């Protein structure tokens, strides 16, 4: 039961993050993309930049400080690397972003969160 609630919360967070990105001028190219190396929550594009976005939803703002770490980011980066050629065309850049969400607070968008 807890897993189902967490899954639903995660999907709701991804939906909210997609809405927020669209409001900021991004197009959502894909959601929940599975790769052999992991899953990408959102793939977004604005201009010649593609962002592979990890979305984290927590019950409180305080919990957001510990929602993402280097290990999780490295998994997202590996997954993004596996599919980057499907979304970023010649001459386009890509990066790994994180969007942190909690009830009652604005989304916190960490652009270019992973730099190996």
From Swiss-Prot:
Highest taxon, organism lineage: Bacteria
Gene3D superfamilies for this protein: 3.40.1350.10
GO MF annotations, alphabetized: nucleic acid binding
Pfam families registered for this protein in UniProt: UPF0102
Stored HAMAP family: UPF0102
Similarity comment: Belongs to the UPF0102 family.
PANTHER family listed in its UniProt record: UPF0102 PROTEIN YRAN
Designated name of the protein: UPF0102 protein ELI_05985
Source organism (scientific name): Erythrobacter litoralis (strain HTCC2594)
């Amino acid at each position: 039961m807890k897993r189902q609630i967490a899954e639903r919360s995660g999907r709701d967070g991804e939906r909210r993050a997609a809405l927020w990105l669209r409001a900021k001028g991004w197009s959502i190219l894909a959601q929940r993309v599975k790769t052999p190396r992991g899953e990408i929550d959102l793939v977004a594009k604005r201009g010649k930049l593609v962002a592979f976005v990890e979305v984290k939803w927590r019950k409180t703002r305080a919990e957001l400080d510990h929602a993402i770490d280097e290990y999780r980011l490295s998994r997202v980066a590996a997954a993004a690397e596996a599919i980057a050629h499907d979304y970023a065309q010649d001459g386009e850049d890509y990066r790994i972003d994180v969007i942190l969400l909690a009830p009652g607070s604005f989304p916190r968008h960490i652009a270019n969160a992973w730099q190996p």
